[in-house]
Amino acid sequence: MEYPKIYLALDNCFALKRWVEPETWLPIKDLGYTSIQASYDNEFDMLYNTKEYIDSWLERLTVAEKQYGAKVQSFYSGYQTYRTSGLAHPDRRVVNSIVEGWIKPAVKIAGERNADMGFALHGIPENIMQDPEKYRECHEKLYRIYSDIGEYARKNGQVHVCVEAMYSPHHTPWTIEGTKEFLKNIYSLDGNAIYTTVD
């Protein structure tokens, strides 16, 4: 059996989200960390920053990685979870906006940098939670959305996309068994893998 390569990475959120420039946090290598998980939320958000800023930030990251001998292995976002129903929103226009305006650009960036990515970008609305049939339908939609994201990630740099396992029924998956089902149901559609993160 071949085991996967595992990195002990430091998520730069440990610094209370105050290190927003690569030059200021890549010296963390002095503590022995060479793998870093950068936060889309802290450094650059596709919905709130300009393309010029994001491009500049990524150029600075490349220079800092070479200077300090450390690498961003993955990018992550969590704060969107608390802002919107996101990918579980009942209006497809909201879902499309997040996929086209946030997820696809994030995948492209991760793919170009040979990094992986993850997020928690769906919260099921309360009225759907209270209706078992609507709850099931919402999950079916999520499986399709995530399968499509998995395909896009595969075609744009073989990016591993992780969905953070959360802690309440509106942020599925939230149990071990539910996580297994979530991942299996996504993969069963078209063979596009989505992974999970346990925080």
Labelled PLM ranges:
Residues 1-115, 147, 188-197:
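N-terminal pre-domain/capping segments
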Residues 67, 83-196:
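Active-site acidic/histidine proton-transfer and metal-coordination neighborhood
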